Amino acid sequence: MADKHLDARKGDSAHYQIDAAINRIAWAGDPDHNLLGILSTGQNIPTYTITAGGTSGQTSWLKKDADEILQDLMNMYSQVSKSTKNIERPDTLVLPTNIYTALSMKRVGDTADTVLTFIQRNAPFLKKIEMAAELNDDSVETNPYAAASNGSGVALLYTNDQKKLAIHNPMAFLQYPVQVRNLETIVPCEARTAGMIIPFPMSALIAIGV
């Protein structure tokens, strides 16, 4: 371990814990303090329930083929477009980590394409596809639809524009000078967040059951 002053390590630990707490709030909110996350029902972001594919008969994207997944995406995009009279055009898709990994490694038939590259080429409205462990089906701290077993992973389709949605942190992490109390050192730290601010909830969509 690199030589590092104890006070600096305490500060790093506090910074990590505060960042982790803000991240949880950004996704799931904090009902005790009336803070909303992007997946909080109070945000009024529309939801879309994944249905069984016509060929596979499955709902999970782990078991669907590329065409069925693409159809789900088209249905998701169409729901946003129709409900907003084509004003909102989401351009970013965030997937659970296991779904993203599987799609990036699973080939389409005997071609050189993976399911992920197939989607990127055939869904031109998507500028970016990302992954987030917070959306996993067992991420109970950040995904309201998750559970220890038999939970639902979710996908988030949204417009990557801070005018549409953004986390508001009035105070970034602040570390005060070291204080000595009763033969121990104290490193006071604080940060403040207002959670996710989403003026245009119809610009996003939460797909349940991927």
Task: List PLM regions with ranges.
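Residue-level signal for secondary-structure boundary elements
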Residues: 22, 26, 85-88, 127-131
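Extended, solvent-exposed, turn-rich assembly/linker loops in the middle of proteins
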Residues: 39-114
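Alpha-helical scaffold segments that mediate packing/assembly in large oligomeric complexes
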Residues: 1-71
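Residue-level marker of positions within ordered structural domains that often coincide
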Residues: 19, 23, 98, 192
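Short, well-ordered alpha-helical packing segments
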Residues: 11, 15-18, 74-77, 116, ...
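Sequence/fold signature of self-assembling virion shell proteins
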Residues: 104-210
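Helix N-cap / beta->alpha transition motif
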Residues: 1, 95-98, 200-201
